[in-house]
């Protein structure tokens, strides 16, 4: 039996949960209520639901497919401009939230801590945002001429209205002469960040490595290999840890040709298929592209 003093604490905490839920709209509050509970001794379960898809527009600690692509895989590539394509909120909340350290001059040749968004409004939902996206990419290339490419990170509304970001990517890539990578990472696609990792890996395969293969056929890929070439994959340089790994590898006479995404560049990604070995730090987020290279 729960002592009276503990029962009072339990009731206080239940009231606190009610107070938190009162700030939500009625429909959202009903859904969030299932995820909040007070621990009571002797209960047969934890009292909360889990493994449920993130809801578009509702902040969660778990993240979504967009977070897995933009926040983890693509965002740390420092010399590319990463556009959060959709309403301003997703890009704002994912902006500079991770300590992906990098070397470079922000706004000149590196853009990792900058926030770029197409800032979707109601009219864009009605009429589509393709033209707006084309104009945005063109303007960004004028404003930041030292960028080495662009990634388009789709937010939920883009998938719902069916914008053709692939056509935009092909068109603008020809215009600016740089890689433009469309990533269908709308948040509603995955229960967590995990599917976003997979989608992002697939886009590296389809839009970056194909470019590398073509350059190799054309004889324009400038790469002189050695037997000691390696790539560090899936290290996001959180707090600078990739730099420490790189120093250790170079001390044993390995040549680190590429490291990504942390402090990584699009050119390093293009060179990666030529190395002798991939060294994976975060298996969960980068095993897909590593398996592709192993099997190719």
Swiss-Prot record:
EC number: 1.18.6.1
Subunit structure comment from the entry: Tetramer of two alpha and two beta chains. Forms complex with the iron protein (nitrogenase component 2).
Top-tier EC class: oxidoreductase
Known role: This molybdenum-iron protein is part of the nitrogenase complex that catalyzes the key enzymatic reactions in nitrogen fixation.
Stated name of the protein: Nitrogenase molybdenum-iron protein alpha chain
Requisite cofactors: [8Fe-7S] cluster; [7Fe-Mo-9S-C-homocitryl] cluster
Gene coding for it: nifD
UniProt remark on cofactor binding: Binds 1 [8Fe-7S] cluster per heterodimer. Binds 1 [7Fe-Mo-9S-C-homocitryl] cluster per subunit.
Keywords from the UniProt entry: ATP-binding, Iron, Iron-sulfur, Metal-binding, Molybdenum, Nitrogen fixation, Nucleotide-binding, Oxidoreductase
Pfam name, any one: Oxidored_nitro
Residues that coordinate or bind [7Fe-Mo-9S-C-homocitryl] cluster: 282
Binding-site positions, [8Fe-7S] cluster: 64, 90, 156
Coiled coil: none
